[in-house]
């Protein structure tokens, strides 16, 4: 992938950009095999990759510069701002949005937040696009509600310029720290969730719910899990750390009893909305801590699917799964190091199948799917 920002030494986020995709996949596969070297693996499936550019459905832009000439991008470690509107990871559809946002910021008087001086209001612009209909969600992350009235007043112009903006919100993040969002979300549109669709499964994206940033690869990940589950003799499963329900909704059949657990209420609201659309009445989604939910149960389902954050599922949940011994565990991980550490804590299981998904091209990161079977 060619990138003018990288070539000019202005951005180094894509550290592997000079390597061809097959070389990147080989290096990632070697890393994964090294991490799982102590475990016999019955089947290594071919790695899955997607487009090498224009694949991201989300932009997280630090707003810097001046109110008259805002920059959207990032801050270097020394505080120097860098505009990333031309980043080739973003689809072409993002360019007109960035172009309209700059004069809008000036018109609405949204002074960019200055980290060094601890002054200003607009901290971040967060943009998400649906692959199914091109609709977009735009979030303004502000330090306070001081400029909210001005933003509301100027908003009709932006909506006229960009009719693809279906959901617009203001998030209030008052803390002087590099935290992307605060707890308060103020909706400026009637619509509160962005409709998405993977493999004919309706999904919803809300402001404070996690959603994969590489839809081309994520849709293949979900489809693969569905295929793996359909091959297993199970009618009951848990989907832990379920997010907006992507895995569970793909796996569910009318006679499958499924419980999805996720700590974020916004994500659970999305999952419930999708289940209702599909008419699946045996799916139950709850906003709870996954580890606390599981370890409080006196019995375990035949299949437990886990998709934890980078820290992994942790020893308490590993100990519970070791003791209760479900027939199958499907582990989806964005950090193979912690996954390998967790598998070490599950001695009663063997690794039936492993597949790498290149969710983050041009970096060392990847997603991995592992099927564990009770010995």
From Swiss-Prot:
CDD domains: AdoMet_MTases. One of its GO terms (biological process) is rRNA base methylation. [4Fe-4S] cluster binds at residues 3, 11, 14, 87. It comes from the Bacteria. Its EC number is 2.1.1.189. It catalyses: uridine(747) in 23S rRNA + S-adenosyl-L-methionine = 5-methyluridine(747) in 23S rRNA + S-adenosyl-L-homocysteine + H(+). S-adenosyl-L-methionine binds at residues 212, 241, 262, 307. InterPro entries: 23SrRNA_MeTrfase_RlmC, MeTrfase_TrmA_AS, MeTrfase_TrmA_CS, SAM-dependent_MTases_sf, U5_MeTrfase_fam. The keyword Transferase applies. The active site is at residue 334. It holds the Pfam family tRNA_U5-meth_tr. The keyword Nucleotidyltransferase does not apply. GO terms for molecular function: 4 iron, 4 sulfur cluster binding; iron ion binding; rRNA (uridine-C5-)-methyltransferase activity. PANTHER family: RNA M5U METHYLTRANSFERASE (PTHR11061), TRNA (URACIL(54)-C(5))-METHYLTRANSFERASE (PTHR11061:SF30). Catalyzes the formation of 5-methyl-uridine at position 747 (m5U747) in 23S rRNA. Belongs to the class I-like SAM-binding methyltransferase superfamily. RNA M5U methyltransferase family. RlmC subfamily. This is 23S rRNA (uracil(747)-C(5))-methyltransferase RlmC. It comes from Shigella boydii serotype 18 (strain CDC 3083-94 / BS512). The gene is rlmC.
